C-alpha cells in the first residue's frame, strides 16, 4: 500500500502535535504555514535586540507532552528541558497588597491564611480539592475525547465522577461559584481570572473552569529558551521523522480531488494529499476563506460569540519598586467594569495587566541591565473593524502603566520602543477571528459542547487548534492535534 499523505495547514501547536504523531507513525506529512517559522500564536519577537515570547507564556500539563512524545518513542524531557516554577504567579493590588501562589499546596494555603485570614485559607483548601475532582472527572471523558459530547461526558465520568461535577454547581458561573469558597473579593478576582485563560469572562463562564487551578497546581514549567522553543522542538522532531515543512507558504485554497484534496498556495503551487488537518481558526473554514466548498464543514462563530483578544507590548527595560517573578498579575480595582467594557466592545478604562518577565524564574532579585518584558491587557475581538486609532492605543498604554505604578512597578527605561500588537494585527495573523485568540468564548455551560470536534462534516478534513475541541490553551491545542492525528490515521487505514 502506498504511503498515505496528510497535509497540515498551519504550524501552530495543534498542527505541530499532529505532524509529530503522524510522521512518527510513518505517514507522509507536509506542513504549510504562511509564517517564516513554526509556532502560530507561540510566536517570537524581539525586545532589546533579544528574542522574546510574544504569545502564550504559561506551560502546564507537561505530562500530555511526555505521553505524546513517548507514543512515538521520544523522551520529552531530553528534547525540551524545563524547570518547574515554585511560584506559580505573583499577584498585586493597589499599594503593597501582594500574594504568591505556590506549587506546594500547603505553602499556598498558609499564604492565603497570611493574606486574607483563616476562613479564606479553609475556603482555598476546599476550592483546591474540588478543582482537582473536576479535572479528574473531565480529563478522560471530555478533554481527551475527539468531540464534545454531553452524554459521553456523563458516561465517561461514571457514577463516581458525576457527583464531583455536580458538587461545584457546573451550571452556575465561575464568579458565583467562587463565592462558595471566598469572601475576600481579591481572591475571587484572582481565581476568576482563570476564565481569561480561555478568553472568557468569569461573570459568564461556567464554574467548571475552576479546574484551571488544579492544572496550574499540577505544575507550571519554564522551558529552556521560552515557549517558542517548544514549537521549534516539535517541528524538529517531526522533521527528523520525515515531515516536510513549508514556511512562507500561504494555503489559499483547499479543493476536492477525487477521494483526496488539492492544496493551492498563494504562489500557485499545488500539492495532492489524502487528508487535511486544518490548524487555523475554524471560522476561516466556515467563512469560506479556503474555498466556498467548506463553508458548511464546521459551524461559524458569530462575532458576539468570539473570545477575547488582547493588546500586548514587548519591550526591554530596567525595573524597580516591585519584585517581579516570571508570571505577575496587577489587578485593577473594579473587575466587573473591565468585563462590562469588553462586552460592549470597548477598551478597558482601568485594566488588569499581566506581565511576563522572561529573564526571571522564582528569583525576584533585580536583573542586571534591561530585562525582556511582555505586558498584556484583555481587549474585545473587534480587529475586523480596523486598527485601533494611535491615540487610543497610546492612552491604553498610559492606563496600563498607571496600573503597574499603582502596584509599585516602575520602569527606569521608558518603554518607548515597545512593540505593540492589537486586535487588528491579531486578526491579520489569524484570519476570520476579529483578533479573538481563543476561538469561541466559553460563556454558559453549553459553550464547551458547541466547539467543533476534530472531525468536520467533510470526510478527510480535520480540525486542530484552540478553536476546536477541547479548547484554548497550549496543552488543549496539543490534545486536539493529537486527537486529529489519531482520527486521520484510523480513517485512512480503514479505507
Regions found by a protein language model. Name each.
Residues 4-137:
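N-terminal glycine-rich phosphate/pyrophosphate-binding loop and immediately adjacent elements
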Residues 94-204:
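Rossmann-like flavin
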Residues 184-198, 350-354, 410-470:
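A glycine-rich dinucleotide-binding beta-alpha-beta segment and adjacent secondary-structure elements
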Residues 211-257:
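Helical element adjacent to the flavin cofactor pocket in flavoenzyme catalytic cores
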Residues 252-367:
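Mid-domain catalytic core of redox enzymes
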Residues 318-428:
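C-terminal segments that line or cap access tunnels to active or ligand-binding sites in enzymes
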Residues 466-488:
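A conserved FAD-binding loop/helix module that cradles the flavin
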Residues 490-495:
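Active-site-proximal substrate-binding core of FAD-dependent oxidoreductases
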Amino acid at each position: 500500500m502506498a504511503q498515505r499523505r496528510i497535509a497540515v495547514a498551519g504550524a501552530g501547536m495543534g498542527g505541530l502535535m499532529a505532524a509529530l504523531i503522524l510522521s512518527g507513525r510513518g505517514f507522509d506529512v507536509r506542513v504549510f504555514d504562511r509564517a517564516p517559522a513554526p509556532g502560530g500564536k507561540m510566536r517570537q519577537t524581539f525586545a532589546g535586540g533579544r528574542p522574546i515570547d510574544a504569545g502564550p507564556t504559561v506551560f502546564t500539563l507537561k505530562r500530555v507532552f511526555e505521553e505524546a512524545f513517548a507514543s512515538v518513542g521520544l523522551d520529552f524531557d531530553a528534547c525540551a528541558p524545563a524547570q518547574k516554577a515554585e511560584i506559580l504567579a505573583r499577584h498585586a493590588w493597589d499599594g503593597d497588597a501582594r500574594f504568591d501562589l505556590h506549587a506546594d499546596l500547603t505553602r499556598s494555603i498558609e499564604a492565603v491564611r497570611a493574606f486574607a485570614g483563616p476562613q479564606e485559607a479553609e475556603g482555598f483548601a476546599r476550592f483546591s480539592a474540588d478543582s482537582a475532582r473536576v479535572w479528574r472527572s473531565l480529563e478522560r471523558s471530555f478533554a481527551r475525547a475527539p468531540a464534545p459530547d454531553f452524554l459521553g461526558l456523563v458516561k465517561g465520568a461514571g457514577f463516581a465522577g458525576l457527583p464531583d461535577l455536580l458538587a461545584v454547581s457546573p451550571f452556575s458561573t465561575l464568579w458565583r461559584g467562587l463565592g462558595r469558597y471566598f469572601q475576600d473579593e481579591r481572591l475571587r478576582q484572582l481565581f476568576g481570572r482563570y476564565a481569561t485563560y480561555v478568553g472568557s469572562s468569569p461573570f459568564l463562564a461556567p464554574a467548571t473552569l475552576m479546574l484551571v487551578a488544579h492544572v496550574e497546581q499540577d505544575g507550571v514549567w519554564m522551558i529552556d529558551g521560552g515557549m517558542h522553543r517548544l514549537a521549534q522542538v516539535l517541528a524538529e522532531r517531526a522533521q527528523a521523522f520525515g515531515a516536510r515543512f513549508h514556511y512562507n507558504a500561504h494555503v489559499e485554497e483547499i479543493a476536492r480531488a477525487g477521494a483526496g484534496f488539492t492544496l493551492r498556495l498563494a504562489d500557485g503551487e499545488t500539492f495532492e494529499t489524502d487528508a487535511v488537518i486544518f490548524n487555523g481558526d475554524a471560522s476561516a473554514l466556515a467563512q469560506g476563506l479556503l474555498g466556498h466548498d467548506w463553508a458548511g464543514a464546521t459551524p461559524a462563530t458569530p462575532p458576539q460569540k468570539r473570545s477575547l483578544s488582547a493588546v500586548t507590548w514587548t519591550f526591554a527595560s530596567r525595573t524597580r519598586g516591585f519584585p517581579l517573578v516570571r508570571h505577575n498579575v496587577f489587578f485593577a480595582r473594579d473587575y466587573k467594569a473591565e468585563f462590562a467594557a469588553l462586552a460592549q466592545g470597548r477598551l478597558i478604562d482601568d485594566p488588569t495587566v499581566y506581565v511576563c518577565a522572561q529573564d526571571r524564574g522564582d528569583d525576584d532579585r533585580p536583573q542586571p541591565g534591561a530585562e525582556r518584558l511582555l505586558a498584556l491587557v484583555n481587549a474585545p475581538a473587534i480587529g475586523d473593524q480596523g486598527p485601533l486609532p494611535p491615540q487610543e492605543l497610546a492612552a491604553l498604554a498610559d492606563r496600563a502603566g498607571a496600573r503597574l505604578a499603582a502596584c509599585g512597578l516602575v520602569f527606569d527605561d521608558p518603554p518607548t520602543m515597545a512593540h505593540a500588537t492589537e486586535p487588528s494585527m491579531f486578526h491579520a495573523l489569524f484570519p476570520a477571528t476579529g483578533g479573538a485568540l481563543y476561538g469561541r468564548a466559553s460563556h454558559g455551560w453549553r459553550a464547551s459542547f458547541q466547539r467543533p470536534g476534530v472531525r468536520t462534516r467533510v470526510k478527510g478534513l480535520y480540525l486542530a487548534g484552540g478553536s476546536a475541541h477541547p479548547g484554548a490553551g497550549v496543552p488543549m491545542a496539543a490534545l486536539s492535534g493529537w486527537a486529529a492525528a489519531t482520527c486521520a490515521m484510523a480513517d485512512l487505514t480503514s479505507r
